[in-house]
A protein has these predicted regions:
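HIT superfamily nucleotide-processing domains
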Residues: 1-123
């Protein structure tokens, strides 16, 4: 979470933080989601690290398939379903499972500060 009242400082901090998250295997997409908002004079930025873009249930077949591809809002707890059938069958346990699946492990999270400070030292 980045909290700032100065957008210039916020931008600099954000770019350094985002550099700590390597892109996916194809090098096309960074593995994180961002949620940003402003309250009064404060800017809030929440970074959700990702291990993968879509959960296995997205590619499953038959009744196991759920077309849920978590974005920033989903990672923050507002689950978006594009099909009524997915809305009808999703459970709290399934949501937790999907978020855990596309999120990162504790071990991966512990590496982020080191990469952040390495990137910051390069600037």
């Amino acid at each position: 979470v980045i909290l700032s009242s100065n957008t210039h400082y916020d931008d600099s901090l954000l770019y350094s933080a985002l550099a700590a998250f390597p892109p996916d295997e194809d090098g096309k997409e960074a593995k994180f989601n961002l949620l940003l908002w402003k309250e009064g004079h404060l800017y809030y930025t929440v970074i959700f690290p990702r291990s993968k873009h879509r959960p296995d249930c997205y590619f499953a077949e038959g009744s196991e398939q759920m077309l849920i591809s978590p974005g920033a809002l989903d990672m923050a707890g507002v689950i978006v379903t594009t099909r009524q059938e997915d809305f009808d069958k999703i459970t709290e346990e399934k949501v937790a499972s999907i978020i855990k699946e596309v999120g990162i492990t504790v071990e991966e999270a512990e590496k982020i500060p080191g990469r952040y400070f390495d990137e910051k030292a390069k600037r």
